[in-house]
C-alpha cells in the first residue's frame, strides 16, 4: 500500500538495465523499481537519501559495480545473492549491509523473486575508482 502511495505522488521510477549511452540501449529492459521515500531529486550537497528498491532482474552483464556514495541496504523481502571480492553470499530478509562507495559488488536474484530493500545513500563524491568493471577477477582486485 505504501509503494502504491509513493507511485501515486510521483515517487516511483523504473530503472532500466542499461543507460542511453550503452551501445545496446535499444535492448534495455526494466531492472528495478525505485521509490523515493525522502527526496525525488536529491541535491548533491544533501548528505543522504532514503529509497526503496524493488529488484526485477539480476545486475546486467558479467561485471560488478559500485556507487557514487557509501550506502546502507536493508533487505525487507525476498533476498538475493551478492558477489563481493571475498565470495558469493546469500543475503536474506533482515540482512543489513554497510558499503563504501568503492565497494565492487554484483547482485543476482533467485528466479521468480522480486526482493525489496530499504536503501539509504550517503554523501556523493566519495568513490575513488571507476563506476563498474566487466570480467573482473576478484583475486587480483582489492575493495
Question: Locations of the language-model features?
Answer:
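A short, N-terminal "cap"/entry segment at the start of jelly-roll beta-barrel domains
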Residues: 1-49
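Beta-sandwich/jelly-roll carbohydrate-recognition scaffolds of carbohydrate-active enzymes
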Residues: 43-46, 71, 83, 93, ...
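Conserved short histidine dyad/triad with adjacent acidic residue
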Residues: 49-67, 101-102
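Short, solvent-exposed loop/turn segments at secondary-structure junctions
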Residues: 57-58, 80-81, 103-105, 122-126
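Short, conserved beta-strand element in jelly-roll/cupin
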Residues: 66-81
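Short acidic-glycine-tyrosine-enriched beta hairpin
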Residues: 83-106
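A short hydrophobic beta-strand segment most commonly corresponding to one strand
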Residues: 98, 112-129
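Active-site or metal-binding loop neighborhoods of secreted/extracellular toxin and effector enzymes
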Residues: 125-143
Amino acid at each position: 500500500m505504501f509503494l502504491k502511495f509513493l507511485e501515486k505522488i510521483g515517487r516511483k521510477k523504473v530503472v532500466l538495465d542499461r543507460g542511453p549511452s550503452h551501445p545496446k540501449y535499444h535492448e534495455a529492459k526494466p531492472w528495478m523499481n525505485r521509490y523515493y521515500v525522502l527526496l525525488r531529486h536529491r541535491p548533491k550537497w544533501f548528505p543522504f537519501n532514503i529509497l526503496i528498491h524493488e529488484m526485477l532482474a539480476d545486475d546486467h552483464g558479467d561485471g560488478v559495480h559500485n556507487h557514487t556514495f557509501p550506502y546502507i541496504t536493508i533487505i525487507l523481502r525476498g533476498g538475493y545473492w551478492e558477489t563481493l571480492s571475498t565470495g558469493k553470499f546469500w543475503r536474506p530478509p533482515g540482512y543489513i549491509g554497510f558499503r563504501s562507495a568503492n565497494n565492487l559488488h554484483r547482485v543476482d536474484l533467485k528466479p521468480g523473486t522480486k526482493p525489496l530493500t530499504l536503501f539509504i545513500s550517503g554523501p556523493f563524491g566519495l568513490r575513488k575508482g571507476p563506476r563498474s568493471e566487466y570480467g573482473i577477477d576478484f583475486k587480483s582486485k582489492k575493495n
